[in-house]
UniProtKB/Swiss-Prot annotation:
Pfam families recorded: Ribosomal_S19
GO molecular function: rRNA binding; structural constituent of ribosome
Signal peptide interval: none
Protein name: Small ribosomal subunit protein uS19
Biological function: Protein S19 forms a complex with S13 that binds strongly to the 16S ribosomal RNA.
Membrane spanning residue stretches: none
Biological processes, Gene Ontology terms: ribosomal small subunit assembly; translation
Protein family according to the UniProt entry: Belongs to the universal ribosomal protein uS19 family.
GO cellular component, one term: small ribosomal subunit
InterPro entries membership: Ribosomal_uS19 (IPR002222), Ribosomal_uS19_bac-type (IPR005732), Ribosomal_uS19_CS (IPR020934), Ribosomal_uS19_SF (IPR023575)
Biological source species: Leptospira interrogans serogroup Icterohaemorrhagiae serovar copenhageni (strain Fiocruz L1-130)
Gene that this sequence comes from: rpsS
Keywords for the protein's UniProt record, in alphabetical order: Ribonucleoprotein, Ribosomal protein, RNA-binding, rRNA-binding
Length: 93
């Protein structure tokens, strides 16, 4: 279910403080965050955010196409193991 328009997009306060501080100092150094639920704002474009996926921090470079999405969408939490090509059991009919 989508978030109500009257509430506006969500971003954690500590994350917004980090972004405004880096923008005021004109720095683009990467920083860590556990806030996967925060929405990407236009102020964040050009920054590299290290998003926690439950095990490690994944670097996410933010560009214009990511605005409006959540940070967690770009840091996968599950590892995909490719399907085995020679699996005889699955090939039976």
């Amino acid at each position: 279910m989508a978030r109500s328009v009257k509430k506006g997009p969500f971003i954690d306060d500590h994350l917004m403080k980090k972004i405004t501080k880096l923008n005021s100092e004109n720095q683009k150094k990467p920083f860590k965050t556990w806030s996967r639920r925060s929405t990407i704002f236009p102020d964040m474009v050009g920054h590299t955010v290290m998003v926690h996926n439950g095990k490690q921090f994944t670097p996410v470079y933010i560009n214009e196409n990511m605005i409006g999405h959540k940070l967690g969408e770009f840091s996968p939490t599950r590892t995909f193991r490719a399907h085995v090509a020679g699996d005889k059991k699955a090939a039976k009919k």
